């Protein structure tokens, strides 16, 4: 239809503007997601597809429809080339998650931790496959670290020994980067904004941080209320924001006046 024809032409232009290590995120809903995926596969290449993100919607309205309620929209993530900028995204754990994931409390330091095996699957012929302190790794496994590193971990009190002499590594909560973000995004709903397609700053911050570095250029060719440009500015990125609608441009300009670079 006319929308697919329009987006097809624009996606080709966007592809040609991508940096060699750049990427693109295409946000759509259930009405066009299947066709948009096919269009993106054709334009960017099936082998450049990275992720399909399902994002919880702000106000699902499916109470009278036949079928399961639709409470998500879709973000397709493609890269320009085989390698693109990727900064692994992590989400901070809340107190309950920390206590669940790191169930042991060090009564001396007050730090929470969990323990993990010091061995990993697979046989190695080097030092990690040999005896350490008269201990061999379990059959079919090898030590995760060379002997010198194991000695250093033990010296620092980072190895916990069981009553049977089994060593395990202490992993502390305050040294954890957080929870690695997956492709189902909950609790990142759009703001209740006067602009109908306003996007959550949390969503844009997550995308921009993951796929760009400070000083990089971020572009949004359907800028709407200007969330992408506002977040890019706060994160120290350069940006381009365009839209066909005069109201969108007015809204974006007004919004960006008060944005402070981070």
What would you call each of these model-derived segments?
Residues 1-261:
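Core catalytic lobe of class I
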């Amino acid at each position: 239809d006319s929308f697919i024809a329009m987006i097809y032409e624009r996606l080709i232009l966007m592809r040609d503007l991508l940096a060699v290590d750049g990427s693109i995120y295409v946000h759509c809903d259930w009405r066009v997601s299947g066709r948009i995926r096919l269009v993106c596969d054709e334009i960017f290449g099936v082998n450049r597809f990275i992720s399909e993100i399902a994002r919880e919607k702000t106000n699902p309205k499916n109470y009278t429809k036949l079928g399961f309620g639709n409470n998500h929209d879709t973000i397709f993530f493609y890269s320009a080339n085989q390698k693109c900028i990727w900064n692994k995204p992590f989400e901070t754990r809340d107190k309950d998650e920390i206590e669940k994931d790191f169930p042991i409390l060090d009564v001396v330091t007050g730090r929470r931790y969990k323990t993990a095996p010091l061995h990993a699957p697979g046989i190695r012929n080097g030092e990690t496959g040999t005896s350490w302190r008269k201990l061999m790794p379990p059959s079919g496994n090898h030590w995760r670290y060379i002997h010198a590193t194991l000695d250093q971990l033990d010296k620092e009190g980072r190895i916990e020994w069981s009553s049977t002499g089994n060593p395990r590594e202490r992993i502390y909560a305050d040294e954890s980067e957080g929870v690695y973000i997956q492709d189902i995004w909950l609790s990142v709903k759009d703001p209740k904004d006067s602009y109908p397609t306003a996007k959550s700053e949390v969503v844009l911050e997550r995308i921009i941080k993951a796929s760009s570095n400070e000083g990089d250029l971020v572009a949004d060719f359907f800028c709407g209320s200007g969330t992408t440009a506002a977040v890019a500015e706060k994160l120290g990125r350069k940006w381009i924001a365009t839209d066909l609608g005069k109201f969108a441009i007015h809204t974006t300009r007004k919004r960006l006046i008060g944005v402070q670079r981070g």
